[in-house]
């Protein structure tokens, strides 16, 4: 992530330190009770324009919680923007868009 990067995930986080703190909080609160995680990132759609790029990538993350044994099925979309500065590519923006799956239907079917 560039120092002026932005993350849209559980709020808006600007700057590398704020982004790191967001991920650390998520890992400590949401990831810690999970075991057997399968994080699958699909083929990204990439739009390259000089020193800037945009991508969209679908993601599946499936796991079991330790205490309840409940299966967790997460589907998301990563919308990313990258910038190349001084020959190096880094994230300029990441938006994590949660998506519903067939397993979250309100009617339970």
Predicted regions, residues:
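Extended, polar beta-sheet/loop recognition surfaces of beta-rich domains
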Residues: 14, 104-109
